[in-house]
Amino acid sequence: MAAMKSLATAILVVLLLRRLPRGLSQNCSAAIGELMTCGPYVLPGSNGAPSEQCCSALKAVNHGCLCETINIISSLPDHCSLPAVNCAA
């Protein structure tokens, strides 16, 4: 199960980095890559608090980089011709 979580996180990071604008990608790809340490804490069913490594990696990510990455994640369903995800429902 842990291997599947790590693989899913790695795939997501690679996909996100490919969608970032070139300049932003060059500036934040390493920081986003460091967030791989947070993989076990961002998937449904995870338990416990994030590790110190995860928190340090998150602290190091530029706010603009993090927001752009979240926007890209939010746009994925549209780019895949899928209905939008409504997390409030």
From Swiss-Prot:
InterPro entries: Bifun_inhib/LTP/seed_sf, Bifunc_inhib/LTP/seed_store. It is found in: Secreted. Keywords: Disulfide bond, Secreted, Signal. Tapetum of anthers. Disulfide bonds join 28-65, 38-54, 55-80, 67-87. It comes from the Eukaryota. PANTHER family: PROTEIN YY1 (PTHR35501:SF3). Belongs to the A9/FIL1 family. This is Protein M7. The gene is M7.
